[in-house]
Amino acid sequence: MSSSPWRGIKLALVLFLAAILQAAFANSVSLWGGRPDLLLTTSLVASMFSGEGTAALLGFSAALLHASIAAPPHAGFGSILVSRTIVCFGVGCLEERMYRDSVLVALPIVIFGTLAAECLFFAFYPQHGLLHWARMVLLTAVWNGFLAAPCYYGIRALLGANREGQPNGKL
């Protein structure tokens, strides 16, 4: 599928669905206190199928949804926006230069993207309890890693195997 309004609508619907699932289930699912960040996972995986501009928009949109759901007043709203936008932009830059779309690539992209986004967030909005924060970030990265493959296959089925700007067909 080429870059079209339908592609943008599909990506927006995927982010909206991820936001609904994040709001409904993320707080009730826990692994040693760590919780998944489905919006970040979805935006990172969708960025694998997008160029730089679309990936940055995906990161910003996912961060805006996430911050609207989870950020209390005066608690890093802007830092969430900036950190997610930068990381998704970086993944979008890699799309053309470094890899072909693959579920084997999605796992490290999501894990390292989660770590990068959370470290940037921490740099912009430092918090007390560094060890507790680091533990939660690592657990979130593990959760997001578990969600990477299903998210990848779902987005790939929705968008097709091709990347942004390429016609349908083989890569």
Predicted regions: what they are:
Residues 1-171:
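Terminal, non-globular segments
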